[in-house]
Amino acid sequence: MAMIRSLLFISIAGMTVAIAALLILLVFWAPASVPWAITVVWCRHAVWLGRVICGLDTQVEGLENLPDEPSVIMIKHTSTLETYWQVAVFPKATWVVKREVMWVPIVGWAMNLVLDPIFINRGSGRSAVKQVIAQGKKRLADGIWVTVFPEGTRMPPGETRRYGVSGAALAQQAGCKIVPVAHNAGDFWGRRSIVKRPGKIRFCIGPPVDASTQDPKATNLIVQDWIESKMREISVLYDDEQEPR
């Protein structure tokens, strides 16, 4: 039954995201608020669809922790759900993503138009960090939040690795705060998994971390400690002895 429900969800979500992406491309001439509104509507629809069809009930904790000013979001990446959940919940944000995404037909093009992402080559090391800082500062100055997946890729549920420093370095140079986010979406919708198992998914937004007054490496450790500690609390797949690789 879970497989049937999951395939139904994938089919409907796939059709509707294609429609939304085409609409976005058709209104490329409109003010930026129009394609963004289409994106938010689809993301909320997808969250609703997951709840109705697959029993993926989402619970948000810590909304009061969101700063009033644009900030850097550092969020755990274990599933697909968190990518559109955050669009439905957070203020307008762009993402730091691998450059291959821009070449995905229709959806990738629409994403490029709506989010104006910070595309990086993950293998370019320091050059990628410089890209994130330079482009991220421009987005923040324009009032747009910046989302960073600090592990650099989607991790198998229950695993972690050392966090990249680009998010903390950007926040320091932009003089803004970091909002850490942990969630257990991977427990129910794992990486590369077709089956979505019903359950309560907790998205936990932590207290903002002021990155402007300390070394990015120190800030990174504070953020990583909070996220990984919260993951051990909310995810049944986490090993208490798990250490970053």
Task: Kindly label every feature range from the protein language model.
Residues M3-I4, K130-R245:
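Non-catalytic C-terminal accessory region of glycerolipid acyltransferases
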Residues I24-V41, R51-I53, D68-G125:
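Catalytic core of membrane glycerolipid acyltransferases/transacylases, capturing the structured
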Residues V60, I118-N121, A211:
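Short acidic-hydrophobic, aromatic-tinged amphipathic segments that line or gate anion-handling sites
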Residues V60, I73, W95-V96, F203-I205:
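Generic preference for hydrophobic
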Residues M1-S71:
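Membrane-anchoring hydrophobic helices of lipid-metabolizing enzymes
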Residues V52-V60, V129-K130, N184-D187:
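Short gly/ser/thr-rich secondary-structure transition/capping motifs
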Residues W48, Y84, A168-A169:
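Active-site phosphate/pyrophosphate- and oxyanion-stabilizing loops and adjacent acidic/basic residues
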